[in-house]
């Protein structure tokens, strides 16, 4: 006759109900203890008192099993059970997974972390690891089947397995995780880093990696780097130390972290330009596909030419420069009249304005404001020194380092000296050719030849 959960009662040896519990008797009428007995398709465990064990974790040798409220051993099943080792870093309850033979998964004898593929109720297969006691591991996990806890767990952890009710190994995916880092002095750091876990579940460390078309840099502890990072331009014997001029890479904001390629605007890091960093002033940069930024050169981008200093900051405004084959050898921003180069100086003048886009090198005629005064400039439109201010007589004007030479306002006519000769120009700076007895505001008469050179000057015609 059957009783309880699939238990068949026999008159002699076998299962017997004693009025309060099930026991299993041998032929000598001795109740068995600390062993498994089967009834039908289920296994049951008899404890040290000979009674059937119910709703309890059973430790049998080196293995763990669980019997339900009917005493039957469970199989292919998750169970959340009280944790005998609960504490500050341990939960009050832990998860076990009992295989088809009822035995709980646990760490292998080698102690090395081993993941088991388990089909969830949803039909999705995930990978889980367990410690030597059969507890499902979660959070940061090392390679010795142990959880890593504490403020710097992110440094020592190799795998990440979700929270205490998840446990699934993160693989081929990003996770933004809590990470206390006393060494990060960035004011925008919010005690979290992004990490990427390979398909084997291990976090990427100390490497550059392209993921979904974006390039990332990972620190030695696996954190995705962001903002300014100095990266050597080569490895091994060919390695060149990272410096502001050769290896500044920018890896975006903390919520993006990928390598900035093309245009981006940001505050330079202290290793790039300390003054700009302290001033919290943003500049445009142009990121290169393999890291670093364009530095110390003219570069044509989408049909427009721009200038970049030795730290990669886009130039904007009027500059005197020494340039060779588009490489900027020296530069100084001109912010007032006293900084303008003289006729015999070796520097040439360039202007990076606001149209058609900010920072575009100007060519041809344009107006430049300096010290509150507007001047006309003309910059070369072609040649190896395209963009440099023209010198000498050009288009009926006299230019010095690109600046049109003009006379005092209201004078009508005036004299400009160039290469030892005197030329007559009008109020707008245009050379006056073949003029006879034209009079300026001071009642002085002038006559000029076909080149505009003065042939007569006096109070009379």
Regions found by a protein language model. Name each.
Residues 1-461:
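Extracellular adhesion/carbohydrate-binding repeat motifs centered on closely spaced tryptophans
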């Amino acid at each position: 006759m059957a009783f309880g959960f699939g238990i068949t009662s026999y008159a002699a040896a076998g299962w017997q109900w004693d009025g309060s519990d099930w026991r299993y008797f041998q032929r000598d009428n001795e109740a068995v203890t600390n062993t498994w007995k089967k009834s039908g398709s289920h296994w049951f465990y008899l404890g040290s008192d000979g009674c059937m064990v119910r709703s309890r974790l059973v430790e049998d040798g080196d293995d763990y099993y669980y019997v339900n409220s009917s005493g039957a051993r469970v199989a292919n099943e998750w169970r959340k059970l009280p944790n005998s080792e609960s504490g500050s870093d341990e939960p009050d309850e832990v998860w076990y997974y009992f295989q088809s033979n009822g035995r709980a998964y646990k760490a292998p004898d080698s102690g090395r972390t081993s993941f088991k593929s388990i089909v969830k109720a949803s039909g999705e297969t995930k990978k889980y690891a367990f410690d030597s006691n059969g507890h499902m591991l979660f959070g940061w996990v090392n390679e010795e089947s142990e959880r890593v806890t504490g403020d710097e767990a992110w440094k020592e952890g190799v795998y990440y397995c979700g929270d205490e009710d998840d446990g699934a190994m993160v693989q081929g995916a990003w996770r933004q995780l809590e990470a206390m880092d006393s060494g990060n002095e960035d004011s925008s750091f919010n005690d979290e880093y992004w990490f990427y876990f390979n398909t084997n579940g291990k976090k990427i460390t100390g490497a550059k990696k392209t993921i979904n078309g974006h390039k990332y840099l990972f620190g030695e502890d696996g954190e995705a780097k962001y903002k300014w990072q100095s990266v050597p331009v080569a490895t091994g014997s060919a390695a060149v130390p990272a410096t502001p001029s050769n290896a500044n890479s920018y890896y975006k904001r903390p919520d993006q972290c990928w390598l900035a390629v093309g245009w981006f605007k940001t505050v330079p890091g202290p290793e790039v330009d300390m003054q700009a960093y302290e001033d919290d002033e943003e500049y445009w940069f142009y990121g290169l596909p393999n890291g670093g930024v364009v530095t110390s050169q003219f570069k044509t981008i989408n049909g427009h030419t721009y200038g970049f200093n030795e730290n990669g900051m886009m130039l904007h405004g009027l500059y005197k420069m020494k340039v060779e084959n588009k490489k900027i050898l020296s530069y100084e921003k001109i912010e007032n009249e006293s900084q303008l180069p003289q006729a015999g100086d070796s520097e040439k003048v360039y202007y990076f304005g606001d149209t058609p886009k900010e920072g575009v090198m100007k060519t041809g005629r344009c107006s430049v404001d300096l010290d509150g005064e507007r001047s006309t400039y003309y910059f070369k439109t072609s040649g190896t020194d395209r963009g440099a201010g023209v010198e000498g007589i050009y288009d009926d004007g006299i230019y010095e380092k690109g600046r049109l030479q003009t006379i005092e306002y209201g004078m009508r006519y005036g004299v400009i000296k160039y290469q030892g000769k005197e030329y007559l120009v009008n109020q707008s700076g245009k050379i006056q050719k073949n003029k006879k007895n034209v009079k300026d505001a001071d009642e002085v008469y002038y006559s000029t030849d076909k080149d505009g050179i003065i042939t007569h000057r006096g109070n009379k015609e």
